[in-house]
């Protein structure tokens, strides 16, 4: 399944709808859409990456509000994490895990400094992997994380995928879903990326009703 960051642009929304793409929503969007629910099926990101990019602390209050508003209808929810936090990030995520699971399936963000053994015992039908981290690390370890998720029957999602080449790498790693911003910004990118994601075995588990 393909996700793109939420947008209010009608042309892009309709292009996503026709192609069967979904939306990835996060706390910074709470005020932007004046309480309007997402127009397409969606998952929830915790917003930690956006806060990191803006140089501000993680918005715990905003994430909690997002959970209450949309959590029960989300495909899955990324558990709060600490960008570039390594194992400290995992400890932070574990403090939130039960709360997130009370709303929807949860994905634990894995990043530089983490190994499969750190999360393997947590994974299962309702707890999966959200592959973040630095670009080099993500590309280097993607297959390993895919194998770990597969061994536990867990969902495997890859973050920040905006090119056809990256989609092919997700296919090879056995990812069930990915997200990106390319389609959100430019609807003209959707046909090329959607054609690529329909090739091969990408998301076969989800499409078979896993």
Task: Describe every region a protein language model picked out.
Residues 1-95, 192, 202-209:
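Non-catalytic, usually N-terminal nucleic-acid engagement modules in DNA/RNA processing proteins
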Residues 126-139, 162, 179-182:
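His/Asp/Glu-enriched short active-site or ligand-binding loop at hydrolase and phosphoryl-transfer sites
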Residues 57-61, 116-122, 155-156, 162-180:
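Catalytic cores of alpha/beta
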Residues 45, 108, 170:
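Conserved, mostly hydrophobic/aromatic
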Residues 18-22, 38-40, 72-74, 101-104, ...:
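Glycine-enriched alpha-helix->loop->beta-strand junction motifs that scaffold or abut catalytic
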Residues 29, 49, 133-135, 169-202:
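Glycine-rich phosphate-binding active-site loops on the catalytic face of alpha/beta enzymes
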Residues 41, 94-107, 140-163, 202-209:
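Alpha-helix-loop-beta-strand connector modules within alpha/beta enzyme cores
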Residues 88-95, 115-124, 141-145:
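Distinct, well-ordered alpha-helical segments
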């Amino acid at each position: 399944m393909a996700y793109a960051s939420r947008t209010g642009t009608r042309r892009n929304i309709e292009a996503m709808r026709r192609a069967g793409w979904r939306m990835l929503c996060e706390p910074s969007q709470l005020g932007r859409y004046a309480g309007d629910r997402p127009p397409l099926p969606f998952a929830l990101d915790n917003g930690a990456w956006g806060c990191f990019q803006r140089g501000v602390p993680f918005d715990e209050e905003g994430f909690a509000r997002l959970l209450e508003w949309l959590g029960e209808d989300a495909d899955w929810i990324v558990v709060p994490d600490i960008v570039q936090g390594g194992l400290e990030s995992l400890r932070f995520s574990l403090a939130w895990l039960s709360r997130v699971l009370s709303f929807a399936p949860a994905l634990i963000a894995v990043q530089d400094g983490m190994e499969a053994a750190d999360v393997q015992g947590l994974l299962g039908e309702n707890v999966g992997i959200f592959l973040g981290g630095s670009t080099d690390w993500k590309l280097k370890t993607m297959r390993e994380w895919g194998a770990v998720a597969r061994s536990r029957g867990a969902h495997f999602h890859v973050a920040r995928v905006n090119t056809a080449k990256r989609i092919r790498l997700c296919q090879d790693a056995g990812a069930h879903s990915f997200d990106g911003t390319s389609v959100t910004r430019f609807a003209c990118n959707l046909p090329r990326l959607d054609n690529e994601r329909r090739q091969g075995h990408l998301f076969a588990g989800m499409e078979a009703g896993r």
